[in-house]
Structure formats: C-alpha cells, structure tokens
C-alpha cells in the first residue's frame, strides 16, 4: 500500500516536472497551453459524485476555440483501477491520433489524424501508473474547418450507497477542439524573390508585414540564426516542429514602427538576411480619459475631470463586431480598477440574487488563454488583442478614477454564436416571408 502510494507521489512529481519543462519550452517558443485535467484538478476531475439512481452522469470538460500554430492541447485522464475509476475509458482509445467528430459517438466512429490533414508526430502520448497524458500540437499549416472531440469517460463507473436510494456515479470529461482555417495570410520566404548580393551564396529578403501575418521559411540543419533589433515585436508565436520549417506569427498590434533583421548561416556558409518591416498600428478603438473624444490616442473617450463630482460616465467599445475589431485600449494615468486591467477585469455576476461587478481574470471570463496584452505603465496606457473570436458574448469593465470621479470603460465582446444566431434569424424571416406570400 505504501509502495503504491509512493509510486503515485513520484508520478505526480514527474508529471508536474514534465509540465514545468514543457512550460519553459513553450514560453521560449511563445506557444499557449490548454490543459484539460480530468484527474488532478478538483473542479474538472471525473471522480464519482452522489446522484439520484435515475439521474444521468454529470459532464465536465473544456472547449478550445481556434488554437493557433504551435499551441499545446493537453488531456490528462485517470487509468482504470478498482476504486473510483473502475469502468473509465478514453474514447477514442488512441486520442489524439484519432478523434471523434461527434461528442457522443463510440470508438468505432473515430477518424484518423490523416482525415484531419495533420501528421502523427503532432500527437504525443505518455503513460504514468495512475493516468494518461496526451498532447496535441497544432501544426504550422491547417486549412480545414472542423470540430473534434475526445472523451475521458467515467460515466459507467457506479457504486451503491448502503441504505440510500442514491448512488455514486462517475462523470464524463469532454474535450472539444474547434479548428478553423486561419492561415490565409502566410508569407512563404521560398516564394519571395530575394535580392542577390554580390557575394556568393548570400541572399537578402525585404518583407513588409501586417498585423497577424505569418512568416514561414525553411531552415537547414545546423543553422545559426541571429536577431538584430527585433525585440520590439511583442507577442510573436514561433513554431519549429515541422520538418525544419520555421513559422513566426506576428502579433495583432505593432507598438512601434518595425525595422529589424534576421540573419542565418548554415553549415555550407549559405547566408540569408531577412529584413522585416512593419508600420505602427493605427486607429485603435478604446477610451482615452485625458483628451476629448477623437483627440486622444484612442478613438473614444473624454476628459475625466469634466465629469461632475461623485458621478460616473461610460465609454463603450466593441470587439469582434461586424468590423471584426480585435484590439482595444485604455489610457488612464490615474487610479485604475482593477489595477492590472486588462489581465484582471470587472465582470458582472449574480451573488445572493444581486447582480454585482467582481474582479476576474479575463482568461477565465472568456475561457481562453489566447489573449495578447500590451502596456506602458509610465503613460498609463494598456491594450489587449483577441486573435480568436470567443464562443460566448461577454461584457467587461475597467474603471479610471480621479478625485472621486469615475470614467468607466465598458468592453462588449461579440462571440461566434452571434453569427449563427444572425443566420438563423435571416433564415426564419425568409420562411415567414414565403409563408405570408403564399397565403
């Protein structure tokens, strides 16, 4: 018994060491991790809970909406044992190498990764004594629109409770991954005409970039790469996994004008110079509380000192609306509430039948870590970008306070569901119209 417990503890230590190492690598390569933990996390584990004898199982899980290149999706599922997981199973068995295209189909309905146009090397599997660890790495190129699923299914595990009409029943852990084609803006270096220098085997490329562009180039083995003055390109994503193809995804915002150089030299002394240029991002929607509307650094806002004492005024900004606006900012060189806006935001929740704004992590509100943050503490300027449209519509706030006066930035974030609701309404109106005409 002690030996089994010791092995379990060692496994947990090794697991978190693995995650720490992987996290360090991911930070180096600027990837995002989505962890669906059905074993260690008390909020999402699939252990049995007390339910009525006729009740169905509880479902827990996570949704990964449009992950980008190099991102890691991690599934942690307990192994079958004689206790809480006596009838647990992973469906499909070799997830993520195969996955379901419907949440509740069985193992025989699984499709292979080739159906998804993804190479097997992007699916990583590890086995510990108590649990399975499965990782899907989003590839450099993906050109389909699909929603896929994997299940950590403990719903068949049941235990009677003596003297009660209730039972202990396991939960269903569901991983939902929404994949969308997001690579329409790829710049392939091999298809770009270089400027050939006088020196032999030396090439130079001049690349003009836009926000969210993807730069792809092939790098031979044993190539030395150096960066000159490219540190001002914040929030880039880099992926090196695919056959020596290097992919760099540009951020949603360029804080400054960019003019920097990447240089490489391989073992055959072939030299490549890539000159990257980009213009500073302009016309950012947001609220500047130091200038009149239209006069500040952002499109909207007002002078906070013009607000009557003890009153508040709201400045409203929309993200992911019809114009697909994905970035927003606030300028407040005064007291900011919450202090770390936009990482922390005010979000309305109902507590004791009363609606009130409380502080939450924006990543928790939107249920995604795929958020870009930018800040200039000295100027009191902060920005965020949402490269991926959230699944749910949300309304959040940050407050700028000065001498008892409050200027509220209210951010309305549209969702993917809005589009489908609009399509449904159009279809519904067409049906009503034809019914009316035919009468």
Swiss-Prot record:
Glycosites: 106, 125, 324
UniProt subcellular location: Cell surface; Cell membrane
Prosequence residues removed at maturation: 416-439
Any GO BP: symbiont-mediated perturbation of host cellular process
Domain called 6-Cys: residue spans: 32-182, 283-415
Lipid attachment, kind GPI-anchor amidated serine: 415
Signal peptide region: 1-26
Gene3D superfamilies: 2.60.40.2860
Domain of life: Eukaryota
Pfam families in the record: s48_45
InterPro entries: 6_CYS_dom, 6_CYS_dom_sf
Keywords: Cell membrane, Disulfide bond, Glycoprotein, GPI-anchor, Lipoprotein, Malaria, Membrane, Repeat, Signal
Topological category with respect to the lipid bilayer: Lipid-anchor; GPI-anchor
GO cellular component, one term: plasma membrane
Miscellaneous section: Exhibits a high rate of non-synonymous polymorphism is different strains, suggesting that it adapts to different Anopheles vector species.
Function statement: Mediates evasion of the mosquito innate immune response by suppressing midgut nitration responses that are critical to activate the mosquito complement system. It is unclear whether the protein has a role in passive evasion by making the parasite invisible to the mosquito immune system, acts as a decoy to prevent recognition of another surface protein or anchors the decoy protein. Not required for female fertility.
Identification of the protein by name: Female gametocyte surface protein P47
Native organism: Plasmodium falciparum (isolate 3D7)
